[in-house]
């Protein structure tokens, strides 16, 4: 295994590799193994590589041209924090239909690329992106379909700690790619600061 962005134990502690008991043929290539209880386990090496690739891609965009969406509760705090750190636009919470397709809507926006936390729960954002030819990056678990997703990050997209860690790593890598922090530099906040607090 090549060197990871963080220690393997940190990935494991966040449950980033924990999938579901369902899998799609789209996600099969990202699955490392099946546990005895039928739970699919994602390949952390592939997740790590994909985070690097996507950070490199997103770093080439102006921050205001990136939109990050999270409808589900556990994704909202990480998405907000990601926006604060990177300057990307965010929609945590309900995605109003027409946000990307109705120019008369007061909060209409025209991003050049979109990141969704779950292609199923963020389906409206994915659909509107496809209608406008906007590339879609999605955090995808073992049971997700990739029919409208351009690039998937294979990850547990339901776990509070896992989602926070992915957005923290993406933010850190984007800032490294932009040269905002050194190549081996760190953020001044921890991954736990991206988590939803109760």
Swiss-Prot record:
Cited PROSITE patterns: RIBOSOMAL_S2_1 (PS00962), RIBOSOMAL_S2_2 (PS00963)
Keyword Cytoplasm listed: no
Listed GO CC annotations: small ribosomal subunit
One Gene Ontology biological process: translation
Keyword vocabulary terms for this entry: Ribonucleoprotein, Ribosomal protein
Any one GO molecular function term: structural constituent of ribosome
Pfam annotation, one family: Ribosomal_S2
TM region(s), chain numbering: none
PANTHER family documented for this protein: 40S RIBOSOMAL PROTEIN SA
Family designation: Belongs to the universal ribosomal protein uS2 family.
Designated name of the protein: Small ribosomal subunit protein uS2
Biological source species: Methanobrevibacter smithii (strain ATCC 35061 / DSM 861 / OCM 144 / PS)
